[in-house]
Amino acid sequence: MRMHFVVMVMLLPALMMAGSECRSSCRLTNISITVESEECGSCITIDTTACAGLCKTQESVYRSPLMLSYQNTCNFREWTYETYEFKGCPARADSVFTYPVALSCECSKCNSDITDCGALSQQTLSCNAH
């Protein structure tokens, strides 16, 4: 009986570490963005990085109007912008597409001033046929 207890106590930290690695934590992930330019008559798919995953959060069962409640979401901590220039566009067409590239991620309150705080669609979009 004592041997089983010692083995369980020694395995507990290893099991806890394995469990935390198996969760989908907030991290960089590769995504594809489909961009269509009707003016330029072309459609491309851009590969970039974004932030995705779960963040630890707690929601109180009792909701009080005096206590603000928010949940942490997986957000960009640092990012840069890159541009793609469509080829073969008419002279006055807007041929440049600028998109964000995540460099690092963090769990924080979503800032709706700079972020679309809705859920990211899991559907792969494709260009419309002309």
From Swiss-Prot:
Compartments it resides in: Secreted
Signal peptide: 1-18
GO CC entries: cytoplasm; extracellular space
Disulfide bonds: 26-74, 40-89, 51-105, 55-107, 110-117
GO MF term list: hormone activity
Keyword set includes Glycoprotein: yes
Alphabetical list of Pfam families matching this protein: Cys_knot
UniProt entry tagged with the keyword DNA repair: no
InterPro entries listed in its UniProt record: Cystine-knot_cytokine, Glyco_hormone_CN, Gonadotropin_bsu, Gonadotropin_bsu_CS
Keywords (A to Z) from UniProt: Disulfide bond, Glycoprotein, Hormone, Secreted, Signal
Residues annotated as glycosylated: 30
Main subcellular localisation: secreted
One BP annotation, GO: G protein-coupled receptor signaling pathway
Task of the protein: Involved in gametogenesis and steroidogenesis.
Family: Belongs to the glycoprotein hormones subunit beta family.
Assembly mode: Heterodimer of an alpha and a beta chain.
Name this polypeptide is given: Gonadotropin subunit beta-1
Organism of origin: Cyprinus carpio (Common carp)
Gene transcribed to yield this protein: cgba
